[in-house]
C-alpha cells in the first residue's frame, strides 16, 4: 500500500512508509515483530517461468532473455534484499530468521479471512497467476486456513481479463478497472465467440483455449 503514502500509482518501491504506519498503529518496533511474511514464493514462481519457457521453446526466447536477468537480480535473492531494507529501517533488526514466504493465493485468502468477522468461511481467490495457481478455493476455520482446490496456469480468468484489457487498448495490470467500468455500457454481442475461448465445466472449473493467447511465451 505504499502508493497511498507516496501518491505514485503502482509504486513498486520498498514500502517504508506503509511499514512505519503499521508499526506506529500497533505501537511496535520492527525488531519486536515476531514474523514478517512475503506475499509469494519466488523460487516456485521461477520454476513456473522456466518450465513454461522450456515447454514452448523456441517461442518466447526474446521474452525469456529479458525476464531472466530481472528475476535473478530482484527475485531469487528476495530474502536478502528484504533483510537489508528492514535493517536500514531499524538498526536493531539483526536477523532474517523471522522472514517467511507464503503461497501467493494463501496470502490473498488470509488477507480476506483473518480480518473478517467470520469464524468459518469459504474463500474463493481468482487472479492472474500466483506461483502456479490462478484460482483457488480455501476453507477458513478459526486460525486455520487450507486450500482445497486449485486451477493452474495457463488457465486463468485474470489473464483472460487482461487479454481483453490489452485488446481494447488499455495497459495490462493497470487499465483493467477502466474496462470494468465500461462493461455495463456494452452489449453481449461477442458472447458466442467468448464461449469458444473458455470451456466452463459442470463443476465450475474451466479451461482456456490457448490457441487464442500467447502470454505463456511472453
Predicted regions and their residues:
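Short acidic/glycine-rich loops and adjacent helix/strand connectors
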Residues: 1-218
Amino acid at each position: 500500500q505504499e502508493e497511498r503514502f507516496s501518491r505514485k500509482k503502482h509504486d513498486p518501491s520498498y514500502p517504508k512508509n506503509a511499514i512505519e504506519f503499521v508499526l506506529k498503529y500497533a505501537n511496535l518496533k520492527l525488531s519486536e515483530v515476531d514474523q514478517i511474511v512475503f506475499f509469494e514464493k519466488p523460487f516456485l514462481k521461477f520454476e513456473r517461468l522456466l518450465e513454461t519457457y522450456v515447454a514452448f521453446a523456441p517461442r518466447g526466447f526474446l521474452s525469456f532473455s529479458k525476464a531472466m536477468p530481472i528475476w535473478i537480480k530482484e527475485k531469487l535473492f528476495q530474502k536478502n534484499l528484504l533483510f537489508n531494507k528492514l535493517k536500514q529501517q531499524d538498526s536493531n533488526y539483526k536477523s532474517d530468521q523471522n522472514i517467511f514466504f507464503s503461497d501467493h493465493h494463501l496470502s490473498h485468502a488470509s488477507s480476506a479471512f483473518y480480518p473478517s468477522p467470520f469464524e468459518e468461511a469459504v474463500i474463493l481467490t481468482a487472479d492472474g497467476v500466483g506461483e502456479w495457481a490462478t484460482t483457488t478455493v480455501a476453507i477458513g476455520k478459526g486460525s486455520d486456513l487450507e486450500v482445497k482446490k486449485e486451477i493452474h496456469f495457463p488457465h486463468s480468468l485474470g489473464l483472460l481479463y487482461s487479454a481483453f484489457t490489452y485488446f481494447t487498448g488499455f495497459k495490462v495490470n493497470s487499465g483493467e478497472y477502466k474496462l470494468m467500468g465500461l462493461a455495463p455500457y456494452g452489449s453481449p454481442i461477442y458472447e458466442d465467440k467468448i464461449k469458444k475461448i473458455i470451456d466452463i465445466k459442470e463443476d465450475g472449473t474451466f479451461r482456456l483455449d490457448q490457441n487464442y493467447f500467447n502470454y505463456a511465451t511472453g
